[in-house]
Amino acid sequence: MEICWGPYSHLISLLLILLFHSEAACRPSGKRPCKMQAFRIWDTNQKTFYLRNNQLIAGYLQGPNIKLEEKIDMVPIDLHSVFLGIHGGKLCLSCAKSGDDIKLQLEEVNITDLSKNKEEDKRFTFIRSEKGPTTSFESAACPGWFLCTTLEADRPVSLTNTPEEPLIVTKFYFQEDQ
């Protein structure tokens, strides 16, 4: 499958496959089709995500509770932008604005129906930034707001505009689910 078009397409394709193997199925131009992939995700304090009362929670799951772990479904839009969801892409993470209040929501939307080119879908778009082995996710609709957890376990996954605050975790590990 050719990833890019143009005189340097083979070099760019090779670099993308080597550097971004999980996103190699998507053309960098943002044109579809991009395949959805499921990932295990955990914060730098080893908290995983699970669903409680229709809210995404970060906590330490052990024993029989391990089966509650939510996998994050990701659809690459372009080299750094992604849509994120859970439950097979049927519940999508979005950035909701209400006055000065900005919060993370789960919306019943099929992740594969979203489009980078639709303004109304911008709230579902997250900019993925890698720094070493960790990744952060910034809302495209609310620049400066990052997906986060708190140091305390069993608290909601949310958004913050103070990513350097000591009680907030904005860096995540993730690996493709087998």
From Swiss-Prot:
Encoding gene (name): Il1rn
Domain of life of the source: Eukaryota
Family: Belongs to the IL-1 family.
Disulfide bonds: C92-C142
Family annotation (InterPro entries): IL-1_CS, IL-1_fam, IL-1RA/IL-36, IL1/FGF
SMART domains associated with the record: IL1
Pfam families, per the entry: IL1
Record keywords: Cytoplasm, Disulfide bond, Glycoprotein, Secreted, Signal
GO cellular component, one term: extracellular space
GO biological process: immune response; inflammatory response; insulin secretion; lipid metabolic process; negative regulation of heterotypic cell-cell adhesion; negative regulation of interleukin-1-mediated signaling pathway; response to glucocorticoid
Residue positions the entry lists as glycosylated: N110
UniProt name for this protein: Interleukin-1 receptor antagonist protein
Gene source species: Mus musculus
Function of the molecule: Anti-inflammatory antagonist of interleukin-1 family of proinflammatory cytokines such as interleukin-1beta/IL1B and interleukin-1alpha/IL1A. Protects from immune dysregulation and uncontrolled systemic inflammation triggered by IL1 for a range of innate stimulatory agents such as pathogens.
